[in-house]
Structure formats: C-alpha cells, structure tokens
C-alpha cells in the first residue's frame, strides 16, 4: 500500500501531464487480469475454494477513478483455471470516504478457531479476511468473515484485532503453522523497516513473537510482507522458508520491487541463512507479490501473483476505462543448485508461468539446428495476430570464437506492429555483457516518449544452463500480452516482467531474428505462436 505522502507528490506531477497521455491505447490484455473499470494495485486475499474448484483474487481497488484514491476497496475476481478471470462485485468496503480497506490476506478457518462459523458452512469455505483499515489517524488490522464462500463479508464487531498507534503499520499476511497449531501473521512496520511476526489461537488476539528488521534493501519503506514454505526443485519433499518484502520507493532500478530471503522458521522467529537480499523479478513492473493461502496440489504448494506495474509511473500509463494489470500466477520452487557463476551455487527462487489456454494457434518454427549469420535473418508475419503471443528460444554461443569487446555481438528479436512496424519491441542477448536486453521505447505513444520514469532500456544477467562441445546454451520463454511482457530464463531461474505500450490497434505480430556477428549464435529452437 503506497504511502499517502508519496501519492501526493505523484498527484502533483500528474497535474503537469496532458490528459491525452492517459488515453492513447486501450488494448486490454487477454490472459492478465484487469478490472472492468477503475484503478487496481496490490493483490490481496488469495485462496482456493476446494469445494467449488474456484480461485479467488482480491485486490486494492478504486472503482471511482483510474488513479489511486480514497475510498479504497477490496475488488474481487474468480477463476476456474488461474488464467481467465471473472470480475465480481466489491468484497470489502471502508467505513469512511477518507479511509481505505488496505492490503491484507485471506485464511480458511477449517477448525472454526474464530467461532464465526457453524456446521452449515463447509469447512473449505470458512473464509476470514485480515486487512488493514487505513484512516488519516491510524493503520489498524481488522478481520471480516464470509458466510457465502468469499463473496460478501461481515466485519468483526470488536475490530481492530491489532493496533500499534501508528499510521505506518499494514499489510497483514496470515497462515496456519501446524507444528504449534497457531495462526502466524507477518505485518509491516513500514517506516521502521520491520516485519513483525505475531501468533494467535483464534485470529482475534495476537501476540508479538519477533521482528525481522533492517535487512536487505531498505528503500523508503517496507511493504506487503509474506512468509511461506517453498519446496526444493531438486527434492520436493524438502523445503525452506522464504520471506518476501516489497520496497517502494527506492528499488535499485527505480520505484518499486520485491526482494526475498531464504531461511528457517520455528513458529517464533524467521532466521535468514545469509544477509543476502535476492530479487524476485528483475523487471520494472512486478510489485506487491502475494502467495495463495492454499492451492490445488496439481499446481504445487507455493503460488503467487503480483501487480504488474511500478509506482514511479503507474498513475500515468495509458489505459481506459481501467488502469493496471496483474501478472500471471506463478508456482514457486527453490533451485538449491543454482549456478550463480562458475564457482558458486546459491539457493534461488524459481518461477514458471501458469497459462491455461485451449485456443492457441500452432507453433511457427522459425529456426531449428542452425547457425545464425548477418545474411540469414528469420522473419514471420502473424497477420491475424491479436497482439498476444508466446515464444520459445533456445540458443547457444560459440565459445571458441573471439569477439572484440568493441563489437556489439547480439542476437536480437524484433516484435513489430502489424499496422505500423515503426513501433516495435527489441530484445535479445549480447555476448560481452552476458545479458538479455529489452528496449521498449520504440513507440509513438506520448507516455512512452515523454515520461522520464518509464525506463526504455533494461537488461538481465544470464548464465548458461549447460555447456558442451564449445557451446554455452541459454533458454528463454516469453509471453507478450497486449502491453505486458513476461520473460522466463532457463526455465524460470531468472524472471523479468515489463509493461510496454503501442498505439491502439497496432498489435505486435511481425517477428524478426537477427545478429550482428556471423557464426556466433547457434539456434537450437525458435518458435512463436498466437494466443487467442
């Protein structure tokens, strides 16, 4: 939840931006959730209704405008497959016009520890929301319960259940800790740089257990914490605890981002294995990550979704009548053998996308088992493209070839607009930097050209997933969805999420692959298809 003072500064800047900048494009993403109208930010209250087979997503919502503002509500959406979402009526509303139902989480009170439920409510649908009630005077933790499976909520009459005489105490994330048979809450003392850990028997009375403080990137404040047990990729029967903390403003690349720490939890204290802050997503547009309280085991035990924007420029991105999208849902695991460099293995969070689609077009194979040269670029036009595409690229670098550091030795992909090819995304890999780059600045949209915070160019360090026969192999999967690009490197060892904006109707569909150096890149596989 963004600090009000920071929003005041943003509002001042917004007043200087022409209104036309906010309405130049309105192409709605196909597989990333967007509200029907209004403003959306943090995901909240994620849970799975095992009785109905339905996923629930709540979110910070201003239905009255396309910028953040009070009163702020909990919007609501549901899904049968974690890809296609149905907007639902507002779930939780604040009590005053100058207040907000700020971020929080959902639990399923299977054993009715709260006493809110009777036997007529299926234990799998005993939903309790834990959320921050924000007023100009304070931020306090409230609870509300649902008797209809998460669609409407009744506020607990004795709220607040937790207060700290502070205007910067928010974002409770609650889970059940089976060894102690207690509820555990993490909540942010935002400007003290503390994530406080509380325990409870009944969701109503909370005891402070410990604090995880002053770790990693501090930025301006901590927000949206989360603590979850994440399985090992190598051995799913083993796991470690992961503490997620959001930072805004003050991200290394500007604005907002998510960091995480790997460690152990004993019901009282979270102890990180080291003091290293690790980055969840290396893009500019992935914030306020939250994980689901429970899941369908088909998808694993640790699933999360984030807001696909950045507070530096979120109020100005072109969109109408809604503003902002969510990321795809991602299953998380821990790669305990992640090769950070040739001499060091680290524990690393791994993420892959959930994309349940039945109407995708056929894969168009551009290149297989071929060496790329300057003369043989590969081109394809997906003439009926909707602007939602996915691609897979497996390539290798010839390590025996000597390249001058002064030469930009690149493999580039050019995703061009079908109506106007002068608008395009360029992305690719450059050998000397050993990084995958993105250029999202080739657009005629005024916001892209003029907003100083919308960074046009960025990159992500890449390491090969294997090396053999003098070739170092790399892999990238990408999903382009109208104005959101998600990139997954080496099966999700590294992830980057970024928004982009083209003129309305200029769907990306023409794809070119080029290189600036002969015989340096070997293309094992490159294929693209349309998502409908």
From Swiss-Prot:
CDD domains: GH32_Inu-like. The active site is at 42. Belongs to the glycosyl hydrolase 32 family. This is Invertase 1. GO terms for biological process: sucrose catabolic process to fructose-6-phosphate and glucose-6-phosphate. The lineage of its organism: Eukaryota, Fungi, Dikarya, Ascomycota, Saccharomycotina. Substrate binds at residues 39-42, 60, 102-103, 170-171, 223, 311. Keywords: Cytoplasm, Glycoprotein, Glycosidase, Hydrolase, Secreted, Signal. The keyword Glycoprotein applies. Glycans are attached at residues 23, 64, 111-112, 118, 165, 275, 356, 369, 384, 398, 512.
């Amino acid at each position: 939840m963004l600090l009000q003072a920071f929003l005041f500064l943003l509002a001042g800047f917004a007043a200087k931006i022409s209104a036309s900048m906010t309405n130049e494009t309105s192409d709605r993403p196909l597989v990333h959730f967007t509200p029907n109208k209004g403003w959306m930010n943090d995901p909240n209250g994620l849970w799975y209704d095992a009785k109905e087979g339905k996923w629930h997503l709540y979110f910070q919502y201003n239905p009255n405008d396309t910028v953040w503002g009070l009163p702020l509500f909990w919007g609501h959406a549901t899904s049968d497959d974690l890809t296609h979402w149905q907007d639902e009526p507002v779930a939780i509303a604040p009590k005053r016009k100058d207040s907000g139902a700020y971020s929080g989480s959902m639990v399923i009170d299977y054993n009715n520890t709260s006493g809110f439920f009777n036997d007529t409510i299926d234990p799998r649908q005993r939903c309790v929301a834990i959320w921050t009630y924000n007023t100009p005077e304070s931020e306090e933790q409230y609870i509300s319960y649902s008797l209809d499976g998460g669609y409407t909520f009744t506020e607990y009459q004795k709220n607040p259940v937790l207060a700290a005489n502070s205007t910067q105490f928010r974002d409770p994330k609650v889970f059940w800790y089976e060894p102690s048979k207690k509820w555990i809450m993490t909540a942010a003392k935002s400007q003290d740089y503390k994530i406080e850990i509380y325990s409870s028997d009944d969701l109503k009375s909370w005891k402070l257990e410990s604090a995880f403080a002053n770790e990693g990137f501090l930025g301006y404040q901590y927000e949206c914490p989360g603590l979850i047990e994440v399985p090992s990729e190598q051995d799913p029967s083993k796991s470690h605890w992961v503490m997620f903390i959001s930072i805004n403003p003050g991200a290394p690349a500007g604005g907002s981002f998510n960091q995480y720490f790997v460690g152990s939890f004993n019901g009282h204290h979270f102890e990180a294995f080291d003091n290293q802050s690790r980055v969840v997503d290396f893009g500019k547009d992935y914030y306020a990550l939250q994980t689901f309280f429970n899941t369908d085991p088909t998808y694993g035990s640790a699933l999360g979704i984030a807001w696909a924007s950045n507070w530096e420029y979120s109020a100005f991105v072109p969109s109408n009548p809604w503003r902002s999208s969510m990321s795809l849902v991602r299953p998380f695991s821990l790669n305990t053998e992640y090769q950070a460099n040739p001499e060091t293995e680290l524990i690393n969070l791994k993420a892959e996308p959930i994309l349940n689609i039945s109407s995708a077009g056929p894969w168009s194979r551009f290149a297989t088992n071929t060496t790329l040269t300057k003369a043989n670029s590969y081109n394809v036009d997906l003439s009926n493209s909707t602007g939602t595409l996915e691609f897979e690229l497996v390539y290798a670098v010839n390590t025996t070839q000597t390249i001058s550091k002064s030469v930009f030795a690149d493999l580039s992909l050019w995703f061009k607009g079908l109506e106007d090819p002068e608008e395009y995304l360029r992305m690719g890999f450059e050998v000397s930097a050993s990084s995958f780059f993105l250029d999202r600045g080739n657009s005629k949209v005024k916001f892209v050209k003029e907003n100083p915070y919308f960074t046009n160019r960025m990159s992500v360090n890449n390491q090969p997933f294997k090396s053999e026969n003098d070739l170092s192999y790399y892999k990238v999967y990408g999903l382009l969805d109208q104005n959101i690009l998600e990139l997954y490197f080496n099966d999700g060892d590294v992830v980057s999420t970024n928004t982009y904006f083209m003129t309305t109707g200029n769907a990306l569909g023409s794809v070119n692959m080029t290189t600036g150096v002969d015989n340096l890149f070997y293309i094992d596989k490159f294929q693209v298809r349309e998502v409908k």
